[in-house]
């Protein structure tokens, strides 16, 4: 569920998801979580760059879990920790948007891109969709040859070309609309469509630039990627791998081990005080310890959202 779709704000979305999680846990486990010390880890899109009152999010959590400690981090952090299984290295995540993160999992966290579809997110789904849609409208204007297969695929997905501007400029979900166009582009690229393949290869190169910029000496040569845009065997992933190995000849390219949910669990289990401090200093997260009036915890259960 996206925050804008829910119309609730981050605190409202967290409250709803937490209620569903407690319901799924069942009455016994849910009561244990309410009564016992609990660490809640929340990974959310855009919380750092877009600001917002994260304290109100922690308050919402404590309305249901009064003896909880709350860690709110960028989803780039949970994605990287999950993909790298808690080990040092660098990752690029490419879904609707794109972001790279390199870390030693202690005091250093380097974020690259993640600027959103208007300023960045190069190589992500919205970027791919925009390149494809732009090629089609240029053909409509007579500025290039008509990419027949691409135009047919995009109109099947999004409707007639003359409706695209209204769809995009009247919606709060522009990035999602653009990213919908990326799906047929990826399929056509696999089928040998020249323009679609060229767009996907350029996306892979852009993602490689992001990943290599996120990697830094002293962390690890381990690199990986995650997200639907870079699914294994696709043209984008192939171009990404080739460009990474060209730019970082000694890189240790590995498959992503886990997803952002795995990253949240890993943070709940392993994160230490130095990492907490560095995340806050880099404005990648916010830590809300247990209220001082609460008894000292003897152990922590974890709930990851």
Placement of each model-derived feature along the sequence:
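Phosphate-binding/catalytic loop of phosphoryl-transfer enzymes
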Residues: 44-147, 291-304
């Amino acid at each position: 569920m996206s925050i804008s779709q829910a119309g609730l704000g981050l605190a409202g979305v967290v409250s709803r998801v937490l209620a569903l999680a407690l319901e799924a846990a069942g009455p016994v486990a849910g009561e244990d979580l309410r009564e016992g010390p609990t660490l809640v880890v929340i990974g959310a899109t855009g919380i750092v760059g877009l600001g917002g009152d994260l304290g109100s999010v922690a308050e919402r959590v404590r309305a249901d879990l009064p003896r909880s400690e709350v860690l709110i981090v960028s989803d780039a952090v949970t994605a990287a920790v999950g993909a790298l299984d808690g080990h040092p290295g660098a990752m690029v995540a490419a879904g609707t948007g794109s972001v790279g993160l390199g870390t030693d999992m202690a005091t250093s966290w380097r974020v690259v891109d993640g600027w959103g579809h208007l300023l960045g997110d190069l190589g992500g789904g919205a970027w791919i969709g925009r390149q494809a849609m732009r090629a089609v409208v240029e053909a409509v204007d007579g500025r290039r040859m008509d990419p027949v297969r691409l135009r047919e695929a995009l109109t099947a997905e999004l409707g007639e070309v003359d409706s695209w501007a209204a769809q995009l400029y009247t919606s709060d979900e522009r990035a999602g609309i653009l990213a919908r166009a990326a799906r047929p582009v990826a399929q056509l690229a696999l089928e040998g469509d020249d323009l679609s393949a060229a767009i996907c290869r350029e996306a892979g190169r852009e993602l490689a630039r992001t990943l290599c910029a996120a990697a830094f000496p002293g962390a690890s040569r381990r690199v990986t990627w995650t997200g639907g845009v870079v699914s294994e065997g696709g043209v984008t992933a192939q171009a990404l791998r080739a460009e990474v190995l060209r730019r970082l000849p000694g890189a240790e390219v590995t498959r992503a081990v886990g997803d952002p949910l795995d990253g949240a669990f890993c943070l709940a289990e392993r994160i230490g005080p130095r990492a907490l401090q560095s995340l806050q200093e880099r404005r990648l997260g916010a830590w809300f310890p247990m209220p001082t009036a609460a008894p000292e915890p003897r152990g922590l259960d974890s709930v990851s959202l």
